[in-house]
Amino acid sequence: MYSILVCDDEKDIVSALKIYLMADGYQVFEAYNGKEALEVLKEQDIHLVLMDIM
């Protein structure tokens, strides 16, 4: 199973993406800032990161 990290400060965006990705069979991790994202990346084997750069 592929794992995806969704990182965005907008919780609604993260929730919506998580719903769609999980429905397609992906394991989804959440982060709401860069520090949280780095912690997830240290602890999990992540295949793809989706993030808002703005």
What spans do the regions from the language model cover?
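Non-catalytic signal-transmission and effector/linker regions of two-component phosphorelay proteins
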Residues: M1-L5
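Walker B beta-strand of ABC/ABC-like P-loop ATPase nucleotide-binding domains
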Residues: V6, L50
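Conserved functional loop/turn residues at catalytic and ligand-binding sites
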Residues: D8, G25, D45
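The short loop immediately C-terminal to the conserved phospho-acceptor aspartate in CheY-like receiver
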Residues: E10, I53-M54
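Two-component/phosphorelay signaling modules centered on CheY-like receiver
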Residues: K11-F29
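Acidic, metal-coordinating helix/loop segments flanking the phosphotransfer/catalytic sites
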Residues: E30-L48
